[in-house]
Swiss-Prot record:
Basic residues bias: start-end ranges: 1-19
Similarity comment: Belongs to the bacterial ribosomal protein bL32 family.
Domain of life: Bacteria
Protein name: Large ribosomal subunit protein bL32
Region of interest (Disordered), ranges: 1-20
Keywords: Ribonucleoprotein, Ribosomal protein
Biological process according to GO: translation
InterPro entries recorded: Ribosomal_bL32, Ribosomal_zn-bd
Length: 67
């Protein structure tokens, strides 16, 4: 395992950590039953009835799995 030769300064530590940034997820806008919803691309979505009960999973307009 690598062992540092000497202690890293706070400035260098903060400069290194400043490169770690969270990315904003890209969302796809879809219209379901007159409502606009946003979801992650390339993911199966849950199709619900009017009462909110999950019916099945759908991907690209096709039924892919039962819930």
């Amino acid at each position: 395992m690598a062992v540092p030769k000497r202690k890293q300064s706070r400035a260098n530590t903060h400069a290194r950590r400043s490169q770690w940034k969270a990315e904003v997820p890209t969302l796809v806008k879809t219209v379901e039953n007159g409502k606009v919803t946003y979801s992650l691309p390339h993911r199966a979505k849950v199709v619900e009835d009017s009462a909110g009960t999950a019916l099945f999973l759908e991907y690209k307009g096709r039924k892919v799995a039962d819930v």
